Amino acid sequence: MPGLFLTLEGLDGSGKTTQARRLAAFLEAQGRPVLLTREPGGGLPEVRSLLLTQELSPEAEYLLFSADRAEHVRKVILPGLAAGKVVISDRYLDSSLAYQGYGRGLPLPWLREVAREATRGLKPRLTFLLDLPPEAALRRVRRPDRLEGLGLEFFRRVREGYLALARAEPGRFVVLDATLPEEEIARAIQAHLRPLLP
C-alpha cells in the first residue's frame, strides 16, 4: 500500500503540533502505521537550533531550511511513504513560502526553484492550515524564538501568504479556524481525511 503524506501549517501558536499529535494518535488507534515528523530539524536536527537562535540573512535562512528539508525528504519522508505509512509533518515547504517569501520578501520563483530540488517535487496530499489572527498567535507563544520576535506586521504578511497559498491550491489545502476548541479542530481534520483512508 502506498503511503499518504499530510502536513499541518500555520503561525506559531496556531495549534499545529497539538493537532499533528492528535491526528497521529487517531490513526494509530485505527491500527494504521504512522510517522510523525517536523520541520525544521526533521532532516538535520542541528539546523533547528541554528535557525531559531542565530541572526541570519533571509537568503541564508531559506537555504538552511532547504538543506534540512532535502535531508528530511530523503531520510525520513520518502522511506516512510515507501513503507506504506501515513507521514504527518508539522510544517513543510509551505512554511518557507509563507515565512521567507511573504514574510521576509524573498522572490517566490526563486524559493520554488530551490524547493523543487530540495523536495524532489514531493507535495503533500493534504495540508491542514490552522488559520489564526497574528495577534492571537503572539499571545499564545510562550517563549518567542528569533523568528517570532519579528513583530505583528511580519506575521500579518505570513498569514496572508498562507491564505494566498491555500487559495492557489484549494484541492490540497484545508483551512481551519484555529480559534475553535481543540477537539472541534481535531474532528474537522479527521472528517476531511476519512475519504482518503482505505
UniProtKB/Swiss-Prot annotation:
This is Thymidylate kinase. Coiled coil: none annotated. InterPro entries: P-loop_NTPase, Thymidylate_kin-like_dom, Thymidylate_kin_CS, Thymidylate_kinase. Its EC number is 2.7.4.9. The keyword Transferase applies. Belongs to the thymidylate kinase family. Keywords: ATP-binding, Kinase, Nucleotide biosynthesis, Nucleotide-binding, Transferase. ATP binds at residues 10-17. The keyword Electron transport does not apply. PANTHER family: THYMIDYLATE KINASE (PTHR10344), UMP-CMP KINASE 2, MITOCHONDRIAL (PTHR10344:SF4). One of its GO terms (cellular component) is cytosol. Transmembrane segments: none annotated. It catalyses: dTMP + ATP = dTDP + ADP. It is an enzyme of class 2 (transferase). GO terms for molecular function: ATP binding; dTMP kinase activity. Phosphorylation of dTMP to form dTDP in both de novo and salvage pathways of dTTP synthesis. One of its GO terms (biological process) is dTDP biosynthetic process. It comes from the Bacteria. Disulfide bonds: none annotated.
